[in-house]
């Protein structure tokens, strides 16, 4: 699923469909942020490693925000996803 496929769900009159769309949108954004944070952490740690076989070092991904703030955002988004998952279980919503 990608963000475009959730547009119709967000416009539904059924709150369960909007709920699913919100969950999937948040999950997509969370996974993208997680990937960025993983790349940032790997680049930070690679500074202490010798160059790879090709003789190059890992480049730091472009980001304008401090890495610790991005990690905090990921953590809070993860908590929010967990809340949505618990609520879905309670309300019988299949994500």
Where are the model-predicted features located?
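Extended, charge-rich alpha-helical interface modules
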Residues: 1-95
């Amino acid at each position: 699923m990608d963000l475009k496929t959730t547009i119709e769900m967000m416009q539904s009159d059924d709150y369960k469909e909007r709920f699913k769309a919100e969950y999937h949108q948040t999950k997509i954004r969370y996974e993208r942020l997680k990937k960025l944070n993983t790349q940032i952490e790997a680049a930070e740690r690679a500074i202490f490693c010798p160059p790879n076989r090709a003789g190059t070092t890992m480049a730091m991904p472009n980001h304008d925000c401090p890495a610790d703030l991005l990690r905090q955002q990921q953590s809070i988004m993860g908590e929010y996803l967990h809340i949505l998952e618990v609520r879905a279980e309670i309300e019988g919503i299949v994500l």
